[in-house]
């Protein structure tokens, strides 16, 4: 027998190298085979409910790292709730209608307008479902636990029917109407867009300063006066029908030196404009309030038969321009709102493809709208006073990445103004994480216009509206309920397969159709109406779910997307929000803080991360970042996270190895019988349990990450395990000292494994497979630990906090001795502590082997008054470090004066000799194989 065999060196097959890319799919297969999701739901049946509603990602392409952040975050929450005694099902969903799928088919050479519509829509459907399958596999590879066999998809007939019922309820209340006001129009998509489909980019535009000649000055201005206006969209001058001034603003009539014309501009902008126009000097002829100029008539700059009326508007400012806004009601929301008050013509001179229409004039007809600036400049002639290039923020179609325009076209709208205050009241009842989300959503709802819900596309849910012979729109409850039933049975495809009369209830009549003829709407619904009604199609109808949901969790862009649309439809139909709480997250950027894009080559694929590092590393990264703000990720950052993971894994491996001979049923030492340092660690660990439990409740994953890393590296590795290994290795296997520490080891190991399962499910499942004394087959079926408190807890914490200060001071003294070559390792030291009475009382109260705790071989405690001048001194304590006396014990590696060669060929100290002689009689009788001496 070898001497080292008398040591209790921890043994385990749990590998240091994780091998996550290979092992994780094996665990996922085991979970699926064991129907783990189903079993967890069965375990929690009848318990308090927690229902997170999954915002549906768009079914197109593999998932990106933003998807991963979102789904992993949801998985962490749902897993933590499930393990904390909540009935917490997770039904994943997909958004499956919309333009991107049409664009994919177009790139494949499929021409929608040249084929049967039903056949085309079936191709869209099949493509969408193939993308659902692809993304489902991607999410499962991340270890996300969900009801993957029963997701919701917005193309499902039942979902479509429930969506129609939401529409019908809103129509019944009068919230659906048709109007021809300006909407965001994407010429690249040939469709109207909702606010949620807009993104902004900075672009350069040519702005023009020009003048309209006064035609009828109403006795205030003479006909030799010109009113100066400014535009950043020259094409809209073709549809200009008015000039808007601020009613309370001051305007001056000025005559530049050498000019026979006089001009009207805002007083507050005159100096800057004079510089732009090259007016070296000018004479001020008159001053007027904007309200005085109302109803003055001017001529259109080149189409002089068109009159442009001076009108009043509160949206006019002195921030830029001339203080006078040219007004084209067909091309702007403010223009429309103020123009209709004065009954101005709503002229639209750009078609659905962005081409100038015939009514723009022969010089413009057929030209692309943003290419006509040179023509406008030419037509303005000497009425053009200046032009300049400006850089400004401009709206773009978020899908095609092309600029859009405001354009008045007949559309269907969902009113927001009719019940806006009700929505705002519901926002105030909702909990927001982070808290600033409330203000953001509140302001968006407060300031938004009505919602344009019609789209001029094919792949989507049809608007269930019919038209009588006289043009009356029909969307009564009887009709929409019937359409919903048809969709539920056949899918929305039936809308395109049957004539209008066959889609109406049997025997349906309407006074507007004396001949019994009807037509149907050909527009489809905005896809945000699809996902925005999911509270009805999922939470309100699926078994084991509830409405309103406990939580919606999405990216911060969803304040104007899903959070917004869901809130509108839910309040419209039922008078309350669809959620009790909202959690929003920032965007994922690259390691330099830049947006990810294919062109930059900085995209991080979750699948690539899973192949290189493993999904648990990506999950740990999610827990490590502050998702209240934008977060960064790169392979380098993931490498750093992987290093942190390695530290956690190897620490837990140490605990596994050193509890391999520990049976909790027979070897556990009661808290009252633990050593004081073991009690201290038990208390510290239970504080960690409380911290993590609270952080899960607050959805603060980063707090969990920081707390765990600090506990593992500081409290365990750098303190407790640093000296505890000397006890568990050296003391007799069944000794009280060893079993005490193993009790703490095992308690920490089991509970921290449970606590980490929502974040690192693959790793904790592997650890759990080595814990043979735990009854649950999978850690995911276990319950979360509950933090305990102990008698005299605060006193114990205070005493050990004071010791930690003393320990740090002792380490500084040992380091100085090491630098002075007095010792090498700290175990070579004889440390003398010169202590005040207060420190002596502390050391006595600790009731511990202080030499063991400080990892020195020998320790002496003396009076502070006796400290020599060269002692390393601190307040109340001083240290002298000398080389320990004696030889190194081959077994304990400590220097001890009792160390000597024993008759059984072991060079050991008395303490080790006693352990050997009491526990290894055969080795004592036969002698050990070899000795270093």
Curated annotation (Swiss-Prot):
<keyword id="KW-0648">Protein biosynthesis</keyword>
<dbReference type="InterPro" id="IPR013155">
    <property type="entry name" value="M/V/L/I-tRNA-synth_anticd-bd"/>
</dbReference>
<dbReference type="GO" id="GO:0004822">
    <property type="term" value="F:isoleucine-tRNA ligase activity"/>
</dbReference>
<feature type="short sequence motif" description="'HIGH' region">
    <location>
        <begin position="57"/>
        <end position="67"/>
    </location>
</feature>
<dbReference type="GO" id="GO:0000049">
    <property type="term" value="F:tRNA binding"/>
</dbReference>
<dbReference type="Pfam" id="PF08264">
    <property type="entry name" value="Anticodon_1"/>
</dbReference>
<dbReference type="InterPro" id="IPR002301">
    <property type="entry name" value="Ile-tRNA-ligase"/>
</dbReference>
<dbReference type="InterPro" id="IPR023585">
    <property type="entry name" value="Ile-tRNA-ligase_type1"/>
</dbReference>
<keyword id="KW-0436">Ligase</keyword>
<protein>
    <recommendedName>
        <fullName>Isoleucine--tRNA ligase</fullName>
        <ecNumber>6.1.1.5</ecNumber>
    </recommendedName>
</protein>
<dbReference type="GO" id="GO:0005524">
    <property type="term" value="F:ATP binding"/>
</dbReference>
<comment type="function">
    <text>Catalyzes the attachment of isoleucine to tRNA(Ile). As IleRS can inadvertently accommodate and process structurally similar amino acids such as valine, to avoid such errors it has two additional distinct tRNA(Ile)-dependent editing activities. One activity is designated as 'pretransfer' editing and involves the hydrolysis of activated Val-AMP. The other activity is designated 'posttransfer' editing and involves deacylation of mischarged Val-tRNA(Ile).</text>
</comment>
<dbReference type="InterPro" id="IPR033708">
    <property type="entry name" value="Anticodon_Ile_BEm"/>
</dbReference>
<dbReference type="InterPro" id="IPR001412">
    <property type="entry name" value="aa-tRNA-synth_I_CS"/>
</dbReference>
<keyword id="KW-0030">Aminoacyl-tRNA synthetase</keyword>
<feature type="binding site">
    <location>
        <position position="598"/>
    </location>
    <ligand>
        <name>ATP</name>
    </ligand>
</feature>
<dbReference type="InterPro" id="IPR009080">
    <property type="entry name" value="tRNAsynth_Ia_anticodon-bd"/>
</dbReference>
<keyword id="KW-0547">Nucleotide-binding</keyword>
<feature type="binding site">
    <location>
        <position position="554"/>
    </location>
    <ligand>
        <name>L-isoleucyl-5'-AMP</name>
    </ligand>
</feature>
<dbReference type="GO" id="GO:0006428">
    <property type="term" value="P:isoleucyl-tRNA aminoacylation"/>
</dbReference>
<dbReference type="GO" id="GO:0002161">
    <property type="term" value="F:aminoacyl-tRNA deacylase activity"/>
</dbReference>
<dbReference type="InterPro" id="IPR014729">
    <property type="entry name" value="Rossmann-like_a/b/a_fold"/>
</dbReference>
<keyword id="KW-0067">ATP-binding</keyword>
<feature type="short sequence motif" description="'KMSKS' region">
    <location>
        <begin position="595"/>
        <end position="599"/>
    </location>
</feature>
<dbReference type="InterPro" id="IPR050081">
    <property type="entry name" value="Ile-tRNA_ligase"/>
</dbReference>
<comment type="subunit">
    <text>Monomer.</text>
</comment>
<dbReference type="GO" id="GO:0005829">
    <property type="term" value="C:cytosol"/>
</dbReference>
<dbReference type="InterPro" id="IPR002300">
    <property type="entry name" value="aa-tRNA-synth_Ia"/>
</dbReference>
<dbReference type="InterPro" id="IPR009008">
    <property type="entry name" value="Val/Leu/Ile-tRNA-synth_edit"/>
</dbReference>
<dbReference type="Pfam" id="PF00133">
    <property type="entry name" value="tRNA-synt_1"/>
</dbReference>
<keyword id="KW-0963">Cytoplasm</keyword>
<comment type="similarity">
    <text>Belongs to the class-I aminoacyl-tRNA synthetase family. IleS type 1 subfamily.</text>
</comment>
